[in-house]
Amino acid sequence: MKINLKSSLYFIYFLITGLAYAQNNTIAGTISDNSETVPFANIYLKGTKIGTSTLEDGSYILKNIPAGTYKLQVSVLGYQDFSTKVTFKNNEHKTLDITINPASEQLEEMVVTGTLKAVSRSESPVPVEVYSPTFLKKNPTASIFEALQNVNGVRPQINCNVCNTGDIHINGLEGPYTLVLIDGMPIVSGLGTVYGLSGIPNSLIEQIEIIKGPASTLYGSEAVGGLINIITKNTLEAPDFFADAFVTSWGEFNIDVGAKINLGKKADMLLGINYFNYDNPIDNNGDNFTDLTLQDRISVFQKWNFQRKENRIFSLAGRFFYEDRWGGEMQWTPEFRGGDEIYGESIYTRRWEILGKYQLPIKEKVLFSFSYNDHSQNSVYGDTPYIADQRIGFGQFTWDKSLGSHDLLIGSAIRYNYYDDNTTATTSVDEVVIPSLFIQDEISLAKQHSLLLGMRYDYDKRHGSIYTPRTAYRFKITDNDIIRLNAGTGFRVVNLFTEEHAALTGARDVVVTEELKPEQSFNVNLNYLKKIYADNGTFVSIDASVFYTNFSNAILPDYDTDPNKIIYDNLNGKSVSKGVSANVDFSFPSGFKFLLGATLQDVSQTENGVTERQILTESFTGTWNASYEIKNIDLSIDYTGNIYGPMRLPTLGESDPRSDYSPTWSIQNIQFTWKGLENFEFYGGIKNLLDWTPNRGNPFIIARAHDPFDKNVTFDANGNVVATPNNPNALTFDPSYVYGPNQGIRGFFGLRYRIN
């Protein structure tokens, strides 16, 4: 057979060029985490040798890909793995920008609050919610108090229309039932619960962990309703320098600065400074009272880390906080402080804190943790002075020991509380020392089952021995389906003047009808966590809970029996908080993210067979957070908001024209962030888009704002208000009718600068 050489050469040529043509497929793009590009990420086609790493700007390109269908995978330390299917025909050039999720925003993040041990969230028997700095940036605020407004089931409650102080409600329970920690230490408590939630530099926050339900076995009596643990950064994760400043159209100014400083080879320090100023009195609702309290605040935070042999822990941290705030009549100046001519509420707060952790230099893992804070408050509410000092010391030893299937934590703690004020209710200095012992055993029953048992013993000289049991069960159906059941008890001693702002402000008299007994509670919580990874890179997380809390000896302010009094006594019955809560988190490869949360709850009190809703508790809440990134112009958009159902409000009796219930109301915000300049972020937007304020539908918010000292109020022989032509509704001055902020729509603009 004669072979035509020329024809053979043509055949070989077309075969080679055809194969080359068939492999001339490429895919390129950028990998980011919605806040910045991710360098050195591994990206490859599974089952092939085609792969690369992203450059410093997060870009990548894969070349010479044969026709076919592949699974493209991305992996990098600190982020969730990403995968999606891609199909090539011939000579295709695809562009695919990929958004990967930091581990801190997904299921496998590390949490420490639930068991005092660092474990992945999926392995924790206690359901812990985690919120990262990325979440906080979506609605920038000047304080942690404001930042939590978009967390489902958590509501910052403003307690006074004049001074705007507040506390944090979890699942409908009042602020004193919530324990706030910094790095696991009970720094923010007592007076600090009301006045100390501001000034924690956001630049140094690593994450915020939230437990909804009792945590009293590990943390003591204050963690009855829930716990918020603010965890600060370690030096490995902190930037070398960070600055964040913003202003609003109301004249608010906030600046947050952080830096990492090396102190030799074995020590380093984090420094954070927060300064906030608002000095522009505004009265948009026309009652001659400031809508927003004026504030001048500075906070300085330092954290030292020391390197030791075998990576043993040694860290120290400290914070100094000073604030001068006032609210009141528009014409008030400091010369009227404490007088009865012009009404003002003026609060000077000086506070310092220190906390630390030291792991003993022994074979066993024994950790000593301690904290101490000193809180001094010089305040006047009209012509009523409130001068208070509180000092809280805390020390704790924990021994972490594993024995077979048992993971033990044994600890002892001691808490010292000093309190003194100038009120008639405090006749002498109150000093209390409470020693404690606790043990916790997490038992691995099988690969998918674990059981946690805990018991705490406290001794309070006022109330004797206190036992607080706790149990938790975790059933890991699959890696993507987890059920948790938690139950426990709580015990709490109430201090009215550090916890109840209404006891100090307004014209109502405070009446304590009996020696108050400690509150006791029982709680049960059932939680289901589900995660879904779709083939196209979409991630869905569902976190749902059913909760029930029953209080005995509950101490609740009674505004209804006598409109001129706030009566405190132990409830002759029970107080119940029950409901369901769910969060659904969507993350799409296009860069769109959506987080939706909703809570339905019933918070009631039953006394003498009569059940009614508690004051200032909503029947439903909703939160949302929608984000989208337009990569080609380096722009991201965040739309956040919340909605609250009606609440029963404290009025001054049947003749009070103010509504007994709040309407359904919503606060919504939008933000635009541009990241087109290296190391810089520019952001701006509008807060309270609907311009909602509580005065809508009400004749007034503050009763008798024109007569705050009740100089023109007539009383009968029994102390009851008499209706007169000047006071037809028989009212007294009352600023406690408050359920939301009086600050309306406003614009904001800010700048972030970061050096890594």
What are these regions (language model features)?
Residues 266, 365-379, 476, 484, ...:
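Membrane-embedded beta-barrel scaffold of Gram-negative outer-membrane proteins
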Residues 444-448, 541-550, 570-652:
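Gram-negative outer-membrane beta-barrel transporters
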